[in-house]
Amino acid sequence: MANHKSAEKRIRQIKKRTEINRARISRIRTFVKKVELAIASGDKAAANEAFREAQPELMRGATKGVLHRNTVSRKLSRLNQRIKALGA
């Protein structure tokens, strides 16, 4: 329990920020799932389109500090690799 006004304010800010970050992560997961579903269906065109939509969301997550930039790069790289394998 906070004993100072500033500590109470920090608690309010943390709650607000947590909600924003949770929504952002959920949104990113949704976009990644769409790409994975398109890959699983074997539709390269749909997978490419979903990947194109997911890419800025993932990068935004890195910019906002929700995900580490290396994590985002790794996810994008692996998704792209799987999409390219569809055509081969």
Curated annotation (Swiss-Prot):
Keyword Ribosomal protein: yes
Cross-referenced InterPro entries: Ribosomal_bS20, Ribosomal_bS20_sf
Keyword field: Ribonucleoprotein, Ribosomal protein, RNA-binding, rRNA-binding
Transmembrane segments: none
SUPFAM superfamilies: Ribosomal protein S20
Designated name of the protein: Small ribosomal subunit protein bS20
Name of encoding gene: rpsT
NCBIfam families per UniProt: S20
Gene Ontology MF: a single term: structural constituent of ribosome
GO cellular component term, pick one: small ribosomal subunit
Homology family: Belongs to the bacterial ribosomal protein bS20 family.
BP GO terms, sorted: translation
Pfam families hit by this protein: Ribosomal_S20p
UniProt function note: Binds directly to 16S ribosomal RNA.
Domain of life: Bacteria
